């Protein structure tokens, strides 16, 4: 993650963490606010979002109910972001993106060392987006190198052409291409267990 490499840990703590104001639920809690996440995501593809809203306006003027409905459905979900706790966000920046604990073999969860090489009977599928500008290609592929004792025939790496970060999890290509591959993979190895 380029941003995590370019900035010191203290920058994230002082610039990205804010206190929830009164009278909101969670008042005084320290969080990485959803609105900051949203701004960060949208600024990566500013021109595309501006164009989408121009199209939305034109669909409204033209009475194109389908275009309006698709836009609203997409943005209702896209704009639904939650605050992340200070602890979760800062630990992720520090231990995952800056210090690379998992590939270095020093990542702990609930005081237990995580050992990916101990995984032997679980199939592994990773999915990445060709155009993902948040989690670049290779970030989840690394799991294949870390899980050394999963047989090769139980591993699948899928790079989805033509999608960015959001498209890996949602949208037409997710529904028509990624999700069916995931289900096929899950069912294949679920049947082998029985």
Predicted regions and their residues:
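Alpha/beta-hydrolase-fold enzymes
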Residues: 1-87
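C-terminal structured domain segments across diverse proteins
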Residues: 93-94
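Active-site nucleophile elbow and catalytic-triad environment of alpha/beta-hydrolase enzymes
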Residues: 97-116
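Short, conserved loop/helix-junction motifs that constitute active-site signature segments
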Residues: 116-121, 147-152
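Short beta-strand/loop motif that positions the catalytic acidic residue
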Residues: 119-120, 125-128, 132
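Conserved alpha/beta-hydrolase "acid-adjacent" motif
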Residues: 133-142
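Catalytic histidine-centered segment of alpha/beta-hydrolase-like enzymes
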Residues: 134, 158-177
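C-terminal alpha-helix
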Residues: 181-192
């Amino acid at each position: 993650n380029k941003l995590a490499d370019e900035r010191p840990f203290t920058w994230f703590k002082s610039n990205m963490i804010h206190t929830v104001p009164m009278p909101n639920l969670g008042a005084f809690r320290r969080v990485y606010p959803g609105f900051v996440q949203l701004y960060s995501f949208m600024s990566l593809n500013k021109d595309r979002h501006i164009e989408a809203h121009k199209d939305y306006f034109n669909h409204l003027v033209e009475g194109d109910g389908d275009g309006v409905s698709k836009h609203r459905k997409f943005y209702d979900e896209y704009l639904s972001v939650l605050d992340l706790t200070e602890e979760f966000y800062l630990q992720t920046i520090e231990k995952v993106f800056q210090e690379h604990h998992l590939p270095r073999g020093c990542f702990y969860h609930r005081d237990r060392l995580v050992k990916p090489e101990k995984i032997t009977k679980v199939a592994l599928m990773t999915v990445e987006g060709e155009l993902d500008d948040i989690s670049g290609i290779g970030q989840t592929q690394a799991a294949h190198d870390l899980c050394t004792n999963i047989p090769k025939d139980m591993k699948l790496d899928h790079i989805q052409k033509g999608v960015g970060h959001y498209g890996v999890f949602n949208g037409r290509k997710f529904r028509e291409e990624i999700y069916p591959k995931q289900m096929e993979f899950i069912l294949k190895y679920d049947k082998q267990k029985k």
